Amino acid sequence: MRYEFTVGRSCRVKNFLKEHDISKGLLAKIKFEGGHIWVNGEEQFATYPVHEGDVVAIEIPDEAPHETLKPIPFDLDIVYEDDNFLVINKPYGYASIPSVNHDNTMANFVKHHFVSNNYPNQRVHIVTRLDKDTSGLMLFAKHGYAHARMDKQLQQKSIKKHYYALVEGDTKLEEQGEIIAPIARDVDSIITRRVHKSGKYAHTSYRLVADYGRVKLVDINLHTGRTHQIRVHFAHLGLPLLGDDLYGGSLDYGIERQALHCHRLAFIDPFTKKEMVHASSLTDDFETVIMNLQTKKD
């Protein structure tokens, strides 16, 4: 793929490209695997000096596919796609990445999408993951350079994800609030997490959307990305998610997985500098629970 930039100050090409998230590894790939660097239309080395107003163009060679991923057909719900990014509305019940004896995963489904459309880059790059039984928006990069640029936004916490959750308990919630509590591995499990002073800093904010008595619908924003963060934080408040029996959630409301849905995803497209905002409607199982709660409340 070819990208073009205009130089703002005097430096060497490699230093200029570093400012545009071209890593040493990617620069080596350009040099040794068939890529190119041009300055004002002339091919040059990475050490070539450039000056204000010069135009630097690069061609990044195509990537070899992951040998571990299998292209598995699946009717993907594609929310958005361009040359750099793919946004999928993930159904619950599917993990993000494969594991032993579990091939029906979003990574393999996206791999099939890339292969069946004969995309030049067929390596799958997951930018934002979701747990197996969480539904909603997932962001994929369609090549390594796009992934590197989005990793920078992840580090800067400028990718914004909002979740809807149904929680249950007697704890009163304010109209909006913050949960700041460190999360650590559970001493008795390699899977579960807990709030503990030995854990890593974790910050969750929420807004109360609807109150059905013991059950509440909340809109949640993560400021950190700890494993099971939403599930652990709300269980810590005495408000576990419906269907989340791993953290004490009730199975009495007809939802068979944790009631958690990523409904909004916002980020800055690093290539166009435009804000990208994508939305996803609630799933049918979520809607059914809410409808039943509203009926009982009325």
Feature locations, PLM:
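RNA pseudouridine synthases
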Residues: 1-298
